[in-house]
């Protein structure tokens, strides 16, 4: 479930009337504004829509229980109190006091299909960075110039788009769900869990190379990974869990001693928070968004991006130093419990009030 969907759910629980709209023609406005650009002219609505539905793995009242089970939603992801719309235009059946775009594509819809002053753009990371969008980064740059009030989730974005006078809130995790199992097993084991997600910005190739170094150099290492990275690209010595359910991810965290995030660029990634809440020690590449809550040598080990060897070295160091492991684990769990669903919703509401 994506961060925007988690926010919608929590706001609904606080008795706000919330709706999620999936555009059935997501690039319609961009194609009209930039008719000469072939790389958006050829993009149809269905791939974008299907990708959003599959990647977010959440359920709402229009999905039958069997599909809900297949999508791996097995804890409190009930969206019965959130309205869901599939529409070509925002104006079709949706009348709201405020409209929030959650990426560069929907930003064009909010800017051109709502009244002035009602539109916001929640940007989780710099979508104009080529490592994220490649040859579409120019379109994201255009989105940041739209007359929308900008809301961001990390300090780097505050500085990068300072001229837009953005406001800040932090995302969070379901703290009652993510919790440790047996810390004794973690302290005596060599189980490493790696996030392997699709897209250049997620750094899966560096995670896999770090896993190879761990496998070759750390005795009795047990390496697991999860994500949506292509299965045929993951070596057989890695126990790979492709698109696991929420319950399965929790069990992976609980069994792991060290969690590795190899990403190049993130907004404010939740997996390290989930892992720390579940008792893991985190090793992360310095992918921007982790700076919100990770502090090197205090609650994690942070290493340069695009460097498999330093990821491996950090894991090895933690496994060899039990005192360091315990310090990072204890501080990590304390940190994670500050970033909760409830705090996320409260910070968001405060940020929105600031922009009225």
Residue ranges and their predicted role:
Residues 151, 183-202, 208-213:
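Conserved donor-binding/catalytic core segment of Leloir-type glycosyltransferases
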Residues 341-356:
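C-terminal alpha-helical cap of glycosyltransferases
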Residues 264:
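Aromatic "clamp/platform" in nucleotide-sugar-dependent glycosyltransferases that forms part
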Residues 86-95, 127-152:
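Membrane-proximal helix-turn-helix segments that form the acceptor-binding/catalytic region
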Residues 281-284:
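Short hydrophobic beta-strand element within catalytic cores of glycosyltransferases
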Residues 296-297, 301-308, 317-322, 337:
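Conserved acidic donor-binding segment of nucleotide-sugar-dependent glycosyltransferases
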Residues 130-134, 165-189:
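Acidic anion/phosphate-binding donor-loop and adjacent secondary structure
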Residues 251-256:
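Short alpha-helical donor nucleotide-sugar binding micro-motif in glycosyltransferases
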């Amino acid at each position: 479930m994506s961060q925007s969907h988690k926010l919608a759910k929590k706001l609904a629980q606080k008795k706000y009337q919330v709706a999620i709209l999936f555009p059935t023609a997501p690039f319609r406005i961009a194609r009209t504004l930039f008719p000469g650009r072939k790389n958006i002219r050829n993009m149809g609505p269905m791939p974008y829509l299907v990708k959003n539905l599959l990647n977010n793995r959440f359920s709402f009242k229009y999905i039958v229980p069997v599909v809900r089970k297949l999508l791996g939603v097995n804890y409190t992801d009930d969206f019965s109190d959130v309205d869901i719309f599939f529409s070509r235009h925002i104006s079709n059946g949706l009348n709201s006091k405020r409209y929030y775009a959650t990426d560069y594509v929907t930003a064009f819809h909010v800017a051109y299909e709502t009244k002035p002053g009602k539109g916001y753009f929640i940007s989780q990371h710099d979508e104009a960075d080529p490592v994220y969008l490649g040859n579409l980064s120019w379109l994201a740059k255009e989105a940041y110039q739209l007359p929308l009030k900008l809301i961001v989730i990390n300090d780097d974005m505050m500085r990068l788009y300072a001229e837009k006078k953005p406001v800040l809130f932090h995302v969070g995790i379901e703290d009652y769900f993510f919790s440790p199992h047996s810390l004794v097993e973690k302290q005596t084991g060599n189980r490493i869990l790696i996030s392997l997600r699709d897209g250049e910005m997620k750094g899966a190739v560096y995670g896999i190379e770090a896993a190879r170094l761990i496998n070759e150099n750390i005795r009795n290492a047990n390496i697991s990974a999860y994500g949506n990275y292509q299965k045929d690209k993951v070596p057989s010595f890695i126990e790979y869990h492709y698109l696991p359910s929420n319950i399965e991810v929790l069990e992976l965290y609980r069994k792991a001693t060290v969690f590795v995030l190899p990403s190049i660029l993130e907004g404010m990634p939740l997996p390290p928070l989930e892992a720390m809440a579940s008792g893991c020690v985190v090793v992360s590449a310095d992918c921007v968004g982790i700076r919100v809550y990770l502090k090197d040598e205090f609650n994690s080990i942070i290493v340069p991006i695009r460097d498999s060897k330093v990821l491996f070295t950090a894991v090895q160091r933690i496994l060899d130093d039990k005192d360091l492991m315990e310090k990072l684990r204890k501080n990590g769990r304390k940190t994670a419990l500050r970033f909760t669903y409830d705090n996320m919703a409260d910070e968001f509401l405060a940020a929105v009030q600031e922009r009225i």
